[in-house]
Regions:
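Hydrophobic faces of stable alpha-helices that mediate helix-helix packing
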Residues: 7, 11, 31-34, 38, ...
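Short acidic/histidine-centered micro-motifs embedded in hydrophobic/aromatic stretches
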Residues: 33, 60, 117-120, 168
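Hydrophobic alpha-helical packing residues
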Residues: 37, 41, 64, 117, ...
Length: 204
């Protein structure tokens, strides 16, 4: 629970920051949240009795909440909500698994923003080339997932459900969420295929 709810807060902050409806205040909140999460989530996970780490994670969750309440979220949440509704997949777990896939799919459009998040997370500095910093931030998320034993797949997904699930995600996200790259229901299907275990993964 500590790991997945912590990564849920991270997803709130990241999606709020990379979207197209930010303000100076929401950007600051998101950066503060990312910094606190990268500084404290591992400790809170490995030492649940560490009150300082848990207190800082509460602050991070608050800052991330302030950010996305005004700036909204994106396709990570839209897809995750469909998985929760269909299969009862825990929301934080779905977000954690999805986040790197969606960030990579957005491509260069968000590299500059990911670079700023990488600096906040402590995985890059202001002198790091933008593309390198962006890739480093996504890798840091993958590494965090691995440390927490969070995998890359959602085994509950059934291929025959994918058109319906992508329709739900599309209706939630478009036009409500100010995503950096627009995708329709057909394009969103790829994320569900990516989340299927490798032996069943038939994405083309």
């Amino acid at each position: 629970i500590t790991a997945t709810t912590g990564m849920d807060a991270l997803t709130h902050a990241v999606e709020a920051y990379i979207g197209n409806s930010t303000t100076p205040g929401t950007r600051k909140n998101a950066l503060d949240a990312v910094k606190l999460i990268f500084e404290n989530l591992d400790t809170a996970y490995t030492d649940g009795s560490n009150k300082e780490a848990r207190r800082n994670m509460l602050r991070a969750s608050y800052f991330a909440g302030c950010a996305f309440t005004k700036s909204y979220v994106g396709y990570v949440h839209a897809v995750a909500h469909s998985l929760g509704g269909q299969y009862n997949v825990p929301h934080g777990l779905a977000n954690a698994v999805l986040l790197p896939y969606v960030l990579e799919a957005y491509g260069k459009t968000i590299h500059k923003k990911l670079a700023a998040l990488a600096v906040a997370a402590g995985v890059a500095d202001t002198e790091t080339p933008v593309e390198e910093a962006a890739a480093g931030f996504i890798q840091a998320i993958k590494d965090m997932k691995a440390r927490f034993g969070i995998g890359d797949f959602i085994p509950e997904i059934q291929e025959e459900d994918i058109p319906k699930l992508s329709h739900y995600a599309d209706k939630e996200a478009n036009p409500l969420y100010p995503v950096p790259v627009l995708m329709d229901a057909g394009e969103l299907e790829k994320f569900y295929y990516m989340l299927m275990p490798a032996k069943e993964n038939t994405v083309q």
